[in-house]
Amino acid sequence: MRTLLALVVSAALPVAAQNIDWAKVNDEAMRNFQSLVQIDSTNPPGNETRVVDFVKKVFDAEGIASMIVSKDPSRANLIARIKGNGSKRPLLIMGHSDTVKIDAAKWTIPPFSGARVGGYVYGRGVIDDKSDLFAAMMTTILLKRTGAKLDRDVIFVTEAGEEGASEFGIGYLISDHWNDIEAEVCLAEAGGVSRRNGKPYFATIETTEKVGRGARLVATGPSGHGSRPMRGNAIAHLSAAIERISLWDPPMRLNDTTRTYFEKLGQISPPVEAQRFRDLMDPAKSAAAREYLAINEPTFYSMLHTSVSPNIINGGFQSNVIPSEATATLDIRALPDEDINAFYDMMRKVINDPAVQVVAGGQGGARPVPPPTGITSENYKMLEKAFQNVYGVPVLPLMQTGATDMAQLRARGVQCYGVGPMADDEDTLKGFGIHSDQERILEEAVYKHLQLFWQATTAIAGAKF
């Protein structure tokens, strides 16, 4: 592979002063990014080994040693290491190689084309998570080419099975290859940069996440003939319980990450929005602000408390038979420090119906619940500075409402920070966002995300040239 990198090398200059010819690097970077997107690694079944084979071929051409490890030969992970002087513990940079499934009939641009159309790259996984995978891969290549002198090893990992099968990915890596990936700090997915009206607005660094703690509502009542309706109908009881839970405003509780997040939004947002975020902190105005967010800004609203969403309902088997039981499956996303049994008790009081039971269990039961990564460390400050250098916008810590594999790493004491590419705020509502049927990323965002990864990695690793 041709070396498409020009440097002004000076050991006395900090990383920010190094003169990388990004125009040349970007050409190569885009080709590698498109190649990753063109690999079908939908999960299930995964087939992440296809991605690993591509990355290994690129690394071999660069003289970067790597090893492939797997629990299943078709679902491999790859680990590579750029050595430092060992004065600090390693930095892990990673991305997951699998993507969620597609419905090909709903895509107007083929989902594995990596096509460049109108300033965007289209394809499944362009945001989640081949953007991070590509940026970490290219950063590893640039570290090797420049011969950077590092204070810590930089470990690159392409990880399988993040989209629901972590026993092939992070779970397997932690249990069987911890010595190969152990690190002080990690850069992975989940943050990003919000763009409004064509301009970057603010950036986020994910430092903690909510935890899946599912439950079921089980309503019971007498069975009988549908021609003789009964007041004790299980479906009627279940419906009333679902309505009460859906309209419930659980207690708001902020942690260091979410408090800082909303305080900063109260400083940088347009006047009306800013006042609403400030109102959240005012006991006299908080309820009205929360109600607005519940209706208009569900992501913000979910960050305020443990959330409950009824997503599956089952009841009855024949139209003329009153069923004796009806159930609803709930997606509960708990705050990191939530006492989930106490929360179930609150739900029971809200429902207030002896015919409806709250049954604990479901998704995320075995998932660790680590404390948030701190937002005052030197590593966080260096990452914050990298975002400011690349995008020139305020940086906010973020609590992810979904789940990532960083939870397992945080549980092992790793300082994990989630980063991500720039995206237009309106893309989600327009059907172009993460997991959508027309997932896309700005070409500019591809290039800037690599620059962000490079600046963050070289700063945290103490690179000297």
Give a label for each model feature.
Residues 18-126, 133, 143-152:
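Acidic/His- and Gly-rich active-site-bordering loop/insert found
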